[in-house]
Amino acid sequence: MKRRTLKRLTNHLCGELFAECVVMSHIHKDKQQQIDQMMAKILNTQDGLIMRLSHVEPGNVKGFFKKYNQDLYAQEKETAQMIREL
């Protein structure tokens, strides 16, 4: 996969999770602080993943992208689970 495509995928997934948090913040006004922390975590994760993708390790490129995809989907799954628990 191209870096451009991976950046778009990362932005899309993080955007969807962020949108879910916005919806949850309107539904659960009593859990606003937890939701704000989750939104900050999503933005920090997105920034970290995009920075990693912008500076690819020169040695093992295939391994780098494989690890990147694993980390991306692991973060997405973890955050989605946290949203469901609210």
Question: Where do the protein language model's features map onto the residues?
Answer:
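N-terminal acidic leader/helix
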Residues: M1-D30
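Low-complexity intrinsically disordered segments
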Residues: Q33-A40, N44-L86
